[in-house]
């Protein structure tokens, strides 16, 4: 098609499909311009729902244009084609955090989980310092290099500009399993504190290999979240500072959760 022809003219070679959604797909690619493997996300605006095409996508594009951080997936180029297709050229990753956790069962708390989590916290702090929020933090949105050492945050489809309280959000974003009580209850929420909660879920998943809260019955999740987090039986005890950090991130009341800047200063994370 016209878009793929244009990509060839621009020096890109498309490979196999890495993933597919209802109105987008991600393909492996290489280029004469950039070193290393690339991924190209192809978005078909004409097949996308209006809320996505006119609200979430423009936000995502305006945000990814202005962020550069070693722990955030780099976007090299945005190519608009008159047939309604958009090509987002970005760095490719070998795997993601969810795949790594599934492969290993769980991650050793120190140094593996701690090192990866510290990098993700650094990326989220970079965003929050610029009044940007992610709103879809989960293990599958943390990409990893082949050696598993460098983490890169991806997928800014629900991100937006958000100043802190009283600028509250109302859109339910992300996955229920990573959603905070206030988001699940439909209460206008401080999106930065929602990101902090999701970080808590992510750290729990990394070190236990399980979800902290069962999301089969979403309506009753906030009651379970209020009781606090439990650990699977038979799991060797986690380091006390790691458990304490998870408990802080998963505090029921958003106001009592730390900011991501405070999390970044956590002595256990700094090793």
Regions found by a protein language model. Give the residues of each.
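Glycine-rich ATP phosphate-binding loop
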Residues: 25-30, 34-46
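Conserved short submotifs of the Hanks-type protein kinase catalytic core
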Residues: 83-96
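Conserved N-lobe beta3->alphaC-helix segment of eukaryotic protein kinase catalytic domains
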Residues: 43-67
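Activation segment signature within eukaryotic-like protein kinase domains
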Residues: 116-117
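A short, aromatic-enriched beta-strand patch in the conserved N-lobe beta-sheet
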Residues: 77-79
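Catalytic-loop of the protein kinase fold
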Residues: 128-144
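Protein kinase glycine-rich loop
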Residues: 15-21, 26
